[in-house]
From Swiss-Prot:
Belongs to the bacterial ribosomal protein bL27 family. One of its GO terms (biological process) is translation. It comes from the Bacteria. Pfam families: Ribosomal_L27. Residues 1-21 are annotated as: Disordered. The lineage of its organism: Bacteria, Pseudomonadati, Chlorobiota, Chlorobiia, Chlorobiales. HAMAP family: Ribosomal_bL27 (MF_00539). InterPro entries: Ribosomal_bL27, Ribosomal_bL27_CS. This is Large ribosomal subunit protein bL27. It comes from Chlorobium luteolum (strain DSM 273 / BCRC 81028 / 2530).
Length: 84
């Protein structure tokens, strides 16, 4: 019989790398064409006027202008770029 219990391994001890999601350019800020406005998982916020969407659902600016957030159809948030 064992005098001490075996030192078993733990099931914890892992951590995933940060993904740096979220808004990168706030509403009212000036952006140039190609600037990333927000990174997200899925289309939580949809692109509106003068905004494009990438393969990973990243929303970016298509023109130079000012970022505005608004509620679009079905109360879904949208990002627009007002050209400057």
């Amino acid at each position: 019989m064992a005098h001490k219990k075996g030192g078993g391994s733990t099931k914890n001890g892992r951590d995933s790398n940060p993904k740096y999601l979220g808004v990168k350019a706030a509403g009212g800020s000036t952006v140039s064409a190609g600037t990333i406005i927000l990174r997200q998982r899925g289309t939580v916020i949809k692109p509106g006027t003068n905004a494009g969407i990438g393969r990973d659902h990243t929303i970016f600016s298509l023109v130079d202008g000012v970022v505005t957030f608004r509620n679009g159809r079905n109360n879904k948030k949208q990002v627009d770029i007002l050209p400057s």
